[in-house]
Amino acid sequence: MMNGLGRQDIDFNTIWKNIADQVYKILTGSQNVSAMFLYEDVYKLCIAQPQPYCEPLYENIKKFFEQHVDQILLIILDTKSDTISEYLKQWKLFFSGCELCNKVIFRYLNLNWINKKILDKKFGHPPDVYEIQILGLMIWKERLFFKIKDRVLKCVEILIQKDRDGELVQHQFISQFMESLIKLDSVDKDRTLYLIEYEASYLENTRQFYTRESVAFIASSGISSYMKKAETRIDEEEQRSQKYLNSSSHDKMRRLLHSILIEKHKELLQSECINYLKDEKLDEIYNMYKLLSRIEGGLAPVLETVQKYIQHVGIDAIKSIPDRNNPDPKIYVETLLKIYLQFSSIIKKSFNNDVSFITVLDLACHKIFNQNHITRNTTKSPELLAKYCDMLLKKGNKQHEEIELEEKLGQIIVLFKYVDDKDVFQKFYSKMLSRRLINGTSVSDDIEKFMITGLKQACGFEYTSKFQRMFNDITLSAETNEEFKNHLIKNSLSIGKIDFSILVLTSGSWSLHSQTSSFIVPQELTLCISAFQQYYSTQHQGRKLNWLHHLCKAEAKSFFAKKSYDFQVTNFQLGILLIFNTQESVSLEEITKFTNLNENELSRTLQSLIEAKILISKKKDQNSINNNNNNNNNNNNNGEGNNSLVDSANNMQPSSSSSSTQEYTVNSAYSNKRSKVKVSSSLQKETPLQNEETYKGIDEDRKLYLQASIVRIMKARKTMNHVSLIQEVIEHSRLRFQPNIPMIKKCIEQLIEKEYITRAEGESDRYLYAA
């Protein structure tokens, strides 16, 4: 209510004429008008006495809008070349004018008469009156839009088509027209104007245009160029949708484009995948992936193609590796690694690191790794992988920078996850780690621990617990050695001039082959060994030391040649060499007596010393001949004639048949550029027999593991049928190895014999846990 405006008799026609004139100026934008003065006029008419003029005012407004809209229609129809521009110009003026009328000029009429009329009507029946703005829009819709819609829509379609053809157009005309339809729809609860008159036409024109263009473009430019074109078109239409379509239409437009540009050509796109892979066309693969990933199921055939191709390439690469029965671990693993890295890179670059393609890579690599012409079974790959790790982690091979080595080992861990029989890798890795730690040949402790951490992350703490205990033993051994030396000094004890150190290894933590001979320790070592034995027994009561002489090594200084040498040898080699401190020539029989080595170990140890040209082998009845030959070689070749000693060694290997006549002497003509010489030992190299024993040990460990698993499962379940038990045991074991069903059955039978489980009475395929 406005203060100071009392009810009074007024002239309706005069006031209305003023209102109409001013509203016309507002709707045509011809002159600025004071809306508040008009509000006062409307207020006067609404509170007039004796009868308010609300209804006549509403009817006059309605007629005024109708006449004005009819005039606008004529103006637009008279426009020859720029219909859409004129339409939007008139629309903006009319809409903004209606908005001002609704919110300010006729606000009192809306609140105090129109709204009451609407509320008074019976629920469900449309009202006879409308708020002023809605009234104006309804009149525009009925008296103008429907009469001119075809002409205006055609103009909009032409603009959209020109935009698609790359011509410069007034983009705002299209978006403003679309927004005008949304506003016109606001007066109708069905809101079909935008959907029927605009969206449907927009989508249909889009469908027709891209159907024609896609077919023609593929025919003229090929599928590779089409993929780029399609992606560009989709991006362009996404941008157009943001400007030219309501948000409710965006998904419809997207689905339509995907259907026309991708779905209809998906078989052709999918069929090109294999060619792109073979030719390593990474950009084309990426373009194909981007398109097909937009449609449901579009990538399924591509996933299958990629998996088969990786497997094909991998299997072919493995076939090219020489010596399938005894392949080089380095060649084998680096071949696998090359395949993995090659396709991992492709998946990262061309498939956006899509998890589905990563899974496909995993499946393909798993098959390549475990089922190729070299493995034939699943145990060969983990063995070769462990041996390759040993090559990387051991001194003496091609040295890598620490960062490079960590990267390499990280890649090995990735390959490791594809190993089915991780217990095989564990067994071989444990053996080789044992050797590296005992012989001090690890590249570094940090790198060793880096690898163990990677294995622990892959398989858990239990898998690497033995590895960690080995390191603990090495650390404790260093402390024990220091304490032993302090003990000797403190108690004024002497072990001679020998620099003695020892490794105390926990039984069960180390994968070591047992000693097969009762080696007789050289007299020179007995004092230090007995001193340490006594010291250790006082420090650790109840513990027993078992000496592993076949793993011991020593450094011996020699004086038999023209200059002295420091030989790095095994204890077995040392035991033989020390005999020559008291004898110039020693028979095979005497060496056997002094060392107590069995025939195999003695033969291999002697052979290593002969091949190193430290010892010379000869027969007693040929002493003079051999001596003459040696003298001639020394005189003629100035020490370079040592090659003849190799021939002698090759022809005179120790054997039981020649034990009565075979003799050995040190090679006084020995010569080497280095003063420190490491004498290789075949005893420290794994033999086929030892390899076979390793697999036997793995087999036994598996049986024990399966039995323990069966007992744990049955203890928890109490009763299970045969099939369910087999399935659960396989699932329980699969992270360590892939058990075969016959082995599981055998373990079940053994547990029945041991009375851990029993068969249910009357049900041969059901088992009961025996508490």
Curated annotation (Swiss-Prot):
UniProt xrefs under Pfam families: Cullin, Cullin_Nedd8
GO cellular component, one term: cullin-RING ubiquitin ligase complex
Composition bias, Polar residues: 644-654
Family note: Belongs to the cullin family.
Comp. bias intervals (Low complexity): 626-643
Cross-link Glycyl lysine isopeptide (Lys-Gly) (interchain with G-Cter in NEDD8) residue location(s): 715
Taxonomy, superkingdom: Eukaryota
Post-translational modification remark: Neddylated; which enhances the ubiquitination activity of E3 ubiquitin-protein ligase complexes.
Transmembrane residue ranges: none
InterPro entries in the cross-refs: Cullin, Cullin_CS, Cullin_homology, Cullin_homology_sf, Cullin_N, Cullin_neddylation_domain, Cullin_repeat-like_dom_sf, WH-like_DNA-bd_sf
Known role: Probable core component of cullin-based SCF-like E3 ubiquitin-protein ligase complexes which mediate the ubiquitination and subsequent proteasomal degradation of target proteins. The E3 ubiquitin-protein ligase activity of the complex is dependent on the neddylation of the cullin subunit. Appears to ensure that the proper number of prestalk cells differentiate at the appropriate time in development. May govern prestalk cell differentiation.
The protein's annotated pathway: Protein modification; protein ubiquitination
Positions of region (Disordered): 622-667
GO biological process, one term: negative regulation of sorocarp stalk cell differentiation
Stated name of the protein: Cullin-2
Residue intervals of the Cullin neddylation domain: 701-762
Molecular functions per Gene Ontology: ubiquitin protein ligase binding
Keywords: Developmental protein, Isopeptide bond, Ubl conjugation, Ubl conjugation pathway
Organism (species): Dictyostelium discoideum
